Structure formats: structure tokens, C-alpha cells
Amino acid sequence: MAFTNNIREIREQRGIYQDDLATAIGYSTKTVGRIERGDGTPSAEFMLRISKYFDMLVEDVFHVED
């Protein structure tokens, strides 16, 4: 099972820097960048925090692929 996401697209559309997003959700810039690139599996907590920050549903930010 793999996760894809729209984090970078949403962040850039809203003019949010990766550093600012990371600070706002309580994760390192390195972690946010890694998840944006699809280099890791996001935790449930990460998905909830970022979705809440964007005021979006988790499934609108993250997608599960088999």
C-alpha cells in the first residue's frame, strides 16, 4: 500500500513555505519534504495535522494506492 499526496500543490497554491507549514503542524521541514516527495509513509497524526491545517478532509490531501 502506497500513499500519494497533494501537499506541495496545495501549499504552493496557498503561498505557504515548507518551513512555515512544518512549524505550524509541529514537524521538521525534513519530514514534511520527505512526505511531499512520497519518500515515506505518513503517520495518522501527520495526516490529521496537515489536513486540519489546510482545513480539508484527509482524503482530499492523501490518497491510498494498492
Where are these regions (language model features)?
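Short alpha-helical DNA-recognition segment
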Residues: 16-33
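A short, Lys/Arg-rich alpha-helix, primarily the initiator
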Residues: 1-13
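Residue-level signal for the short linker/turn that defines the boundary of a DNA-recognition helix
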Residues: 5, 15-16, 42-45
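DNA major-groove recognition helix of helix-turn-helix/homeodomain DNA-binding modules
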Residues: 45-60
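Short amphipathic recognition helices of helix-turn-helix/homeodomain-type DNA-binding modules
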Residues: 60-66
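Alpha-helical residues within the helix-turn-helix
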Residues: 12, 23, 52
